[in-house]
Amino acid sequence: MKTPKRAALALVCAAFLAAFAPLSVPGTALAESGAAETGLGPVTSMPLPRFVSLKASEGNARRGPGLSHRIDWVFRHRDMPLLITAEFENWRRVEDRDGQGGWIHYTLLSGVRTVTVTAELAELHDSPEADSPVTAKADAGVIGRLGTCQPDWCRIAAGGEKGWVRKSDIWGVMPGEVRE
């Protein structure tokens, strides 16, 4: 039977461990979070969140940052855009346009910017104006390389065609992002 002193000491020890154990144990939820949702990444000092693309034709998204973690999702499209939301050592937490994702090794990612067409049928225009001539059309799911962006329009290249598309018709660029 425990004495009141031992019970109090056990309670204090349990509270201490609960409060500070996540700070010092690799692989815990705090360590795996990688960073806050916005700001600079703790590993690269690059902005978070930010867009990248899948360098490989296949990439495993894991439950946590490390090979010992279970694979939750497999990305199977080279050049698909992904959103990095956190960093931990050589791992990046990413998600696709549907919110699917997990932790992926940084060597499978590229800084080359791409976008996915989200509209059922997106029109590529000659210039960033709604009344400019349509040069091509792209179906939903088409992946294109991102070029210049204005507040509401981006120039993309896909399937040998180039043109300006409304930002609302693509995923892989921040709403107010401007690129030159």
Locations of the language-model features?
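N-terminal secretory signal peptides that target proteins for export/translocation
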Residues: 1-5
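Generic detector of solvent-exposed, compositionally biased contiguous segments
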Residues: 8, 16, 134-136
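Bacterial N-terminal signal peptides
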Residues: 10-24
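Intrinsically disordered, low-complexity polar regions and short flexible loop motifs
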Residues: 66
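Beta-strand-rich domains and repeat architectures in extracellular enzymes and scaffolds
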Residues: 70-71
